[in-house]
């Protein structure tokens, strides 16, 4: 059995850990609000961008001049999985849940005879995926030095992806990220961004107004589609940022409460051991006195 001194050291160490997890929880909580507002503000813009492009695409359906970002390459053989994760850990299952979804998609595609490539954004996803798919990772973007995510960072990633698409390196690109729902709920999400999926209107949907476009639809799409890739990636990065702080806040809260419970149990064991030791010493003193 450990000595009383060892027990005191262990209790002090657990209390120090509890202070750290509590501080990290408070920091995550302070950053979460701003990250959540940014993610929620980006959603309507990204959704409206999709709606506008869908409307214009419907007007130019069948045009031979349609952009490949909309029409695709005509093939479905090579898939690029754009996996966005965090740069840091201590956030529960935030990173692993995104990687798990991407890994499941990759294995399913490979079982169908498809070729799979990875474009990793974030250190944690890259470290996990390279254990199994190292030769299939074609690019890795590290954002550890970025203090605040801006559209310029998403635009740079989008340019790299589009350049590889134009070079014929892949046929389909799917974006993986974590959609922020609440502090305790972050939803791993897969979204195809190349070629853009244009959803057909529902049968009972209200009629959509018809517009005349100037310049021509194809010219508008050629300008909007590359930007839309950047917008969707930017949205994913903002959703990830909010999800990370939400997951970290929840994880550190659990860690703080677990540390408190551990301190309670350790203190109980310490007090019992100390009481037993005192009782033993008293018995020895009494026995010695009686012997005299």
Swiss-Prot record:
The keyword Ligase does not apply. It comes from the Bacteria. GO terms for cellular component: plasma membrane; proton-transporting ATP synthase complex. One of its GO terms (molecular function) is proton-transporting ATP synthase activity, rotational mechanism. Its main location: membrane. SUPFAM superfamilies: ATP synthase (F1-ATPase), gamma subunit. NCBIfam families: ATPsyn_F1gamma (TIGR01146), PRK05621.1-4 (NF004146). This is ATP synthase gamma chain.
């Amino acid at each position: 059995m450990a000595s009383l001194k060892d027990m005191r050291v262990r209790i002090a160490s657990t209390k120090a850990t509890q202070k750290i997890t509590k501080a990290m929880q408070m920091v995550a909580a302070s950053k979460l609000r701003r990250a959540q507002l940014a993610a929620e503000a980006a959603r309507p813009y990204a959704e409206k961008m999709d709606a506008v492009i869908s409307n214009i695409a419907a007007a130019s359906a069948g045009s031979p001049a349609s952009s490949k970002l909309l029409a695709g390459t005509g093939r479905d053989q090579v898939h690029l999985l754009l996996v966005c994760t965090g740069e840091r850990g201590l956030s529960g299952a935030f990173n692993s849940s995104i990687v798990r979804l991407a890994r499941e998609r990759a294995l399913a595609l490979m079982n169908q005879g498809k070729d799979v490539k990875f474009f990793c954004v974030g250190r944690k996803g890259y470290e996990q995926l390279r254990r199994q798919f190292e030769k299939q990772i074609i690019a890795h973007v590290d954002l550890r030095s970025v203090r605040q995510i801006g559209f310029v960072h998403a635009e740079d990633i989008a340019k790299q992806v589009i350049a590889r698409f134009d070079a014929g390196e892949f046929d389909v690109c799917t974006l993986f990220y974590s959609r922020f729902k609440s502090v305790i709920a972050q939803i791993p999400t897969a979204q195809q961004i190349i070629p853009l999926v244009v959803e057909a209107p529902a049968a009972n949907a209200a009629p959509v107004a018809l517009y005349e476009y100037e310049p021509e639809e194809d010219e508008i799409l050629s300008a909007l589609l590359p930007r839309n890739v950047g917008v969707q990636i930017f949205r994913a990065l903002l959703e990830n940022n909010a999800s990370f702080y939400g997951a970290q806040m929840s994880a550190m809260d659990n860690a703080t409460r677990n540390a408190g419970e551990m301190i309670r149990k350790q203190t109980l064991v310490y007090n019992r051991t100390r009481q037993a030791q005192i009782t033993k010493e008293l018995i020895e003193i009494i026995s010695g006195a009686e012997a005299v």
